Structures are given as structure tokens and as C-alpha cells.
């Protein structure tokens, strides 16, 4: 038996519960044994002993003289069938008697219920009659007393002016735009979707526009060329187009792929995955000029007024990555740096700061 491990105040309660559980278990075992004894099947000889004796006795009394075996068996079968019929009839009679007894008990219960209900209603009616008689008597006395009061009350009612209840009205001038409105929200969502689709169509049209790009193949000296592209094309696609154009003239580019080329615009090395559309839409700027203009100008500032910026820019440089690795310590490659969209280039410069320090 497990011991309770806890507070001393709970130990007694736990012991009581264990005792109750043991008592309940004993009762269950006792009932189980009793049911098994009642439902225990006797041996086949004892079960049919009385039935067999009655059949044998009837067979002896009904048989006179010598008979054949077949006649004996037939007579025995008839007696057994009659005996079974009688037993079945007795069983049916017992069942019917039980059913009639149950119906009689139920009818008696229903009769008693109806009598109780009728008695309760009669008592309630008598109480109501007594109360009604008392009320009539009291009302007759009150009527005589209330006659002068009623006259005064009618006079007071004539003098009293009825007060009208004020209706709660809504102010139509109150701003209710902050309240939730399903129709308004659906209308706003439809408008947003329409504007979004219009914007997507405009951007698709913008990306499909042609653009003329002037570039310079840089191998220490510039070789300017011009190529037609779409604004939605990437820098990688632009370099592939440049290779197709330059391979005819420059032998070193015949075995080169676009991955081995670099595009430098306004002293910034532009990654291959960017498109011209990205720089045009964001109005991106480089160290020495704007990145969203691709025509050619020698200087981005006017001679007469240096504070006024012109939107013309320098030709971008297309060069081999191997050339840049060999010459990145020499001007102008020393000024070049990878493009960073988070960095701002407000002031343009075209001089070599390292050379100025020397």
C-alpha cells in the first residue's frame, strides 16, 4: 500500500478516502459473486430432469400393451411437443400477468397524481375566491371613501399641462468619417487596386522605352561607342550587347564573357543585377554626376554658373575586371568604388584627392 507524502492535515483525508475505496471494492466483489451464483448454469441432467420425468410418466400412462419401436418414438415426440407447448403457454401467462400487474401499478400512480393535481387546483380556486370576496368588500368601502378624492383628482388633471418627451435627434453636421464603414472601405480598396494597376502599367511602359547609351571601352584610353537598349534592361544585358559590338575590333575580348566585364558610371562600379530603370526612377547620383542620364557631356557644371547643375553626364566606362585589379591604385581607377544605394553623393568631384595631398 502506498503511503501519502504531503501535509499532515491531508494525511487523514487521504486515509479516509482509501478506506472508502476498499469498502466499495468489497461491495463490488460481493455483488459480482452473487450475480455469478444466480447465473451459474447447472449440469444438463439437472436442468432437464423434471421435464424428462414428466414426459416418461405421461408415456407410461398412455402406452398400453406391446408397441413397436417406431410407434414408441412417435408417441414420445408427440408427448414432448405437447409438454413444450404447455410450458410455453405457462410462460406466456406469467409474462401477461406481470405486464397486467405493472399496468395496474402505473394506472394507480397516474390516478394518485391526477387526484393530487385536482386537489391543488381546488385549494387555489378556494383561495382565489376568498381573496376576490375580500377584494370586493374592500373595493366597495374604498369607492365610498374615494368619491370626493376622485373629484379633486379630475380637477387637478384639467389644470396639469402634459409634458412632451424630447426625442433624441442626430446632428447631421458631425464628422463620422472616423467610424468604420464597409461600403467606404470597399470603395477605397477598389480605388487603391485601380491606382496600383495603373501604376504597374505605367512602369511597364516606361521599362519598354528605348534609351541610347554612350559608353567608352576603357583599356587605359577611351574608345567611345553607342548602343540602343531598353530602360528595363539590366547592366548584365547591357554588357552582353557591348561585347557583341566590341569583339569585332578588340582581340582580347573574343574569349571574354559578360561576367568578366565591369561598368563604371560617374566613378561608381554598378552591380550587374541593377537595371537602368532603377537609376532613372530613383534619380540616383554618383560621385561626379547623375546616374539617370546616359548621354555625353564633358563637365556636369556650366562654366558661367557653377552652382547650377546640368543633367548631362559622362560616358560610362566598360572595362575588363582584370585590368581594374591591375590598375586600381592608379587614377582614375583609384577613385572608383562599388555603388551603395544608401550612400548620398551631394557634392560632385572630378579631381584625384590622393594626388592633391601629394
UniProtKB/Swiss-Prot annotation:
GO terms for cellular component: nucleus. It holds the Pfam family XAP5. GO terms for biological process: chromatin organization. Residues 122-152 are annotated as: Disordered. InterPro entries: FAM50A/XAP5_C (IPR048337), XAP5 (IPR007005). Residues 124-144 have a biased composition (Acidic residues). Belongs to the FAM50 family. This is Protein FAM50 homolog.
Amino acid at each position: 500500500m502506498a503511503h501519502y507524502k504531503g501535509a499532515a492535515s491531508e494525511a487523514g483525508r487521504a486515509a479516509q478516502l482509501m478506506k472508502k475505496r476498499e469498502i466499495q471494492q468489497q461491495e463490488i466483489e460481493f455483488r459480482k459473486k452473487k450475480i455469478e451464483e444466480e447465473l451459474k448454469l447447472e449440469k444438463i441432467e439437472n436442468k432437464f430432469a423434471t421435464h424428462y420425468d414428466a414426459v416418461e410418466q405421461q408415456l407410461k400412462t398412455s402406452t398400453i400393451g406391446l408397441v413397436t419401436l417406431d410407434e414408441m418414438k412417435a408417441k414420445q415426440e408427440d408427448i414432448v411437443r405437447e409438454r413444450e407447448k404447455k410450458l410455453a403457454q405457462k410462460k406466456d401467462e406469467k409474462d401477461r400477468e406481470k405486464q397486467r400487474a405493472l399496468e395496474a401499478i402505473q394506472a394507480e400512480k397516474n390516478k394518485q397524481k391526477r387526484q393530487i393535481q385536482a386537489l391543488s387546483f381546488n385549494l387555489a380556486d378556494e383561495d382565489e375566491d376568498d381573496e376576490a370576496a375580500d377584494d370586493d368588500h374592500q373595493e366597495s368601502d374604498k369607492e365610498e371613501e374615494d368619491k370626493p378624492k376622485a373629484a379633486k383628482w379630475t380637477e387637478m388633471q384639467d389644470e396639469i399641462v402634459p409634458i412632451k418627451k424630447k426625442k433624441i435627434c442626430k446632428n447631421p453636421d458631425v464628422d463620422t468619417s472616423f467610424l468604420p464603414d464597409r461600403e467606404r472601405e470597399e470603395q477605397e480598396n477598389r480605388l487603391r487596386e485601380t491606382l496600383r494597376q495603373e501604376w504597374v502599367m505605367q512602369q511597364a511602359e516606361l521599362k519598354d522605352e528605348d534609351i541610347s547609351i554612350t559608353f567608352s571601352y576603357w583599356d587605359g584610353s577611351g574608345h567611345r561607342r553607342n548602343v540602343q537598349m531598353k530602360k528595363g534592361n539590366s547592366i548584365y544585358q547591357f554588357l552582353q550587347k557591348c561585347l557583341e559590338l566590341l569583339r569585332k575590333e578588340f582581340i582580347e575580348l573574343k574569349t571574354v564573357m559578360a561576367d568578366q566585364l565591369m561598368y563604371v558610371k560617374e566613378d561608381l562600379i554598378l552591380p550587374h543585377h541593377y537595371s537602368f530603370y532603377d537609376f532613372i526612377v530613383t534619380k540616383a547620383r554618383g560621385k561626379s554626376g547623375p546616374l539617370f542620364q546616359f548621354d555625353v557631356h564633358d563637365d556636369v557644371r556650366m562654366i558661367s554658373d557653377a552652382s547650377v547643375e546640368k543633367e548631362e553626364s559622362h560616358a560610362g566606362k566598360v572595362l575588363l575586371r582584370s585590368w581594374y585589379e591591375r590598375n586600381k591604385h592608379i587614377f582614375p581607377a583609384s577613385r572608383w568604388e562599388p555603388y551603395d544605394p544608401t550612400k548620398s553623393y551631394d557634392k560632385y568631384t572630378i579631381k584625384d584627392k590622393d594626388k592633391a595631398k601629394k
